[in-house]
């Protein structure tokens, strides 16, 4: 099953997440199909906190992909801001 989920990057104690489309059997930070955005939970000042390509997310959802709980909340937040 294809899932849209977070893949962790960044340094120790400084997380940065890529929003990726991946096979659910692959490791969290492993192989992915497509990168559709990013999430920076520690963004300060005028740094960008969240960017999602909503058109690509919707395309994958039409193909049968599922959203992780956290990504579903982030997509909802991005749609509200757009």
UniProtKB/Swiss-Prot annotation:
One of its GO terms (biological process) is translation. GO terms for molecular function: structural constituent of ribosome. One of its GO terms (cellular component) is cytoplasm. The keyword Ribosomal protein applies. It holds the Pfam family Ribosomal_S16. PROSITE patterns: RIBOSOMAL_S16. It comes from the Bacteria. Keywords: Ribonucleoprotein, Ribosomal protein. InterPro entries: Ribosomal_bS16 (IPR000307), Ribosomal_bS16_CS (IPR020592), Ribosomal_bS16_dom_sf (IPR023803). Belongs to the bacterial ribosomal protein bS16 family. This is Small ribosomal subunit protein bS16. The gene is rpsP.
């Amino acid at each position: 099953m294809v899932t849209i989920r977070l893949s962790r990057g960044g340094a120790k104690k400084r997380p940065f997440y890529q929003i990726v489309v991946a096979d659910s059997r692959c490791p969290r930070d492993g192989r992915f199909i497509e990168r559709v955005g990013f999430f920076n939970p520690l963004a300060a000042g005028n740094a960008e906190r969240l960017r999602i390509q909503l058109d690509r997310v919707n395309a994958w959802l039409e193909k049968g992909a599922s959203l992780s709980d956290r990504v579903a909340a982030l997509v909802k937040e991005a749609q509200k801001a757009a």
